Each structure stands twice: as C-alpha cells, then as structure tokens.
C-alpha cells in the first residue's frame, strides 16, 4: 500500500505550520497515515521523507496553483531521492469547492454583494500558475460578481494597486486570500488598503 506525503511550501509562521498540520490531519482521516514535507523554509524536504519510504509513495502537493515548486522543485526532490515508485497528484486548486470556501471567508470578513473583490495570490513566474489563478477568480465570481486579480510576491499587478483601482469605483473593497495558510503573505494583505481581508483557505 502506498504511503502519502503532503508537500507544502513552508513558513516561519507558527500559525501557518499549524494550518498545514491540520490539513495533513484532515487528509489522514480519508487515506490513513500522512507524512508532511516542505519545499522551502522548513524541513524535512520531500527527498528526505521519500528516502525513508520503502514501498510506493504518493505526493500530495498542498499548493493552490501549479507553479515553479510543483513543476520543478517537487520532481527534483523525487529524482534526488532515487525512489522508484512515486506518484504526484494534482494541486488543490483551482476548484469550485475552494471558490465556495473563499466566498464564505469573504462574508465572514464583512463582504456584502456589491462590494468589490480582489483575489490575492502569492504569484508565480509560471504562466500556467497565473492562468490557474485567473480560473480561480472566475470560479469565485460565480459567488460574488466580478473579481480582480492581484499578486503579493511575484507578478503584476500588485494587490495594493488593484485595491486602489477598485476603490476608485467608490465601492468598498475586500481581499479574498488565495493562500493556503497564515504567514508573511497573509500579513502583507492587511497593509494593502482594503476594507476587509478574508482569512486564508
């Protein structure tokens, strides 16, 4: 039977680490034991975890879009481990279920119909990931009406700029956090000038 490894980005935020642990626990209730690995900031790495597994392994990328970490880092760790039997699942998003959760997070932050929505993602240099973020925005728009996209770390337009443009319409502006866990990026969203910021997924 295959062993499952949840692969996340990694964060120095204790709350973010707890978020990932809670996700791994939730997955384990569905599939059995789940180990956790990180591609950045924290350890163990996917290659380190894979080196301790004798049988087949399934890597579960805990990412909301398939950017550099998914297309480069994770396969590189698989190759580095030398493990002969590794399957890699798709990323968590975009997905209609996540869009529904995002809409709920927005309502909890005070958003009401008619307010402007900015979907904030970490960003990526990978065009595939950017396309997936726009797909996520389209899925969210089914719940909220038009959704603009902004990036926190990589890519344009930046979240603060998109919030400023949306505010020029005279409406309240809310940020939908397309982030998986608490951490530095979520903290930065509070500084973007919106009327409210939803909690991460």
Regions found by a protein language model. Give the residues of each.
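Active-site-proximal alpha-helix that buttresses catalytic centers in soluble enzyme cores
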Residues: 1-201
């Amino acid at each position: 039977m295959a062993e499952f490894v949840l692969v996340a980005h990694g964060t120095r935020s204790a709350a973010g680490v707890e978020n990932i642990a809670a996700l791994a626990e939730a997955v384990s209730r569905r599939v059995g034991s789940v180990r956790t690995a990180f591609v950045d900031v924290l350890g163990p790495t996917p290659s380190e975890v894979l080196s301790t597994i004798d049988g087949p392994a399934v890597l579960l990328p805990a990412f909301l879009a398939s950017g550099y970490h998914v297309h480069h880092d994770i396969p590189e760790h698989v190759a580095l481990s030398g493990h002969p039997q590794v399957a890699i699942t798709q990323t968590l998003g975009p997905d209609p279920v996540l869009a529904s959760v995002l809409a709920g997070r927005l309502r909890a932050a005070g958003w009401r119909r008619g307010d402007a929505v900015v979907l904030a993602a970490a960003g990526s240099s990978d065009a595939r990931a950017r396309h997936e973020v726009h797909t996520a925005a389209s899925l969210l728009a089914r719940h909220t009406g038009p959704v603009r996209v902004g990036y926190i770390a990589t890519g344009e337009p930046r979240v603060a700029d998109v919030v400023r443009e949306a505010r020029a319409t005279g409406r309240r502006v809310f940020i939908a956090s397309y982030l998986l866990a608490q951490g530095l990026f979520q903290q930065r969203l509070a500084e973007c000038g919106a009327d409210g910021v939803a909690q991460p997924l």
